Design a protein with these regions (language model features):
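Histidine-dependent nucleotide/RNA phosphoesterase domain, centered on the 2H-phosphoesterase fold
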Residues: 1-173
Length: 173
């Protein structure tokens, strides 16, 4: 069973910087995400021993604190499947968040579950699936945007079946 742990990011499709990004990439074949913005902390491709994994969520997240992140960049990268991901990111991952993610991912891997990829802090804003789209062209257009950094407090986490039911939810306090 595929599962994932995410932390929700309260941004809006209507935000001025997001509108400017969509306008800059209007001639690119981007499929924009129109809601449900989050950072995936762990994508577990083959979840073994679900009760053990759920216990890990309680161990680390029941008493975790909210995280402040300053988002200071818009960028694009190529995912393992070849899709280009237009995203919001940061140059400074908070140490506490990185430690939390590392600890959770380590403990999940000890359950013989297969974590699909390394942690790369980003919020997916759009996807380009056409392989002929040049990533450098997309990056150049993104670089032209006058993007002002902003800080958000993230406090809502959810562990769920991929495209399915929620297994664990917590509001960090």
């Amino acid at each position: 069973m595929k599962t994932y742990l995410e932390i929700k990011v309260p941004i809006y499709y209507s935000a001025p910087w997001f509108s400017e990004l969509r306008k800059a990439l209007k001639d690119m074949p981007v499929l924009w995400q129109k809601g449900y913005y989050h950072i995936t902390l762990a994508f577990v491709d083959d979840t073994q021993h679900l009760p053990d994994v759920e216990a890990i969520m309680h161990k680390y997240l029941d008493h975790a604190h909210p995280v402040n992140i300053t988002f200071d960049k818009l960028d694009v990268f190529t995912a393992g499947n070849g899709m280009k991901i237009v995203h919001l990111g940061t140059n400074n991952i908070p140490k506490g968040l990185q430690t939390l993610v590392d600890d959770i991912r380590h403990d999940i891997s000890c359950t013989n579950s297969n974590i699909q990829s390394d942690f790369k802090l980003h919020v997916t804003l759009g996807r380009i699936s056409e392989p002929e789209t040049n990533i450098e062209d997309v990056g150049f257009l993104i670089d032209e945007i006058d993007f002002m950094p902003f800080t958000l407090t993230l406090n809502e986490v959810e562990y769920r079946v991929f495209r399915g039911r929620s297994i664990y939810k917590s509001t960090l306090k």
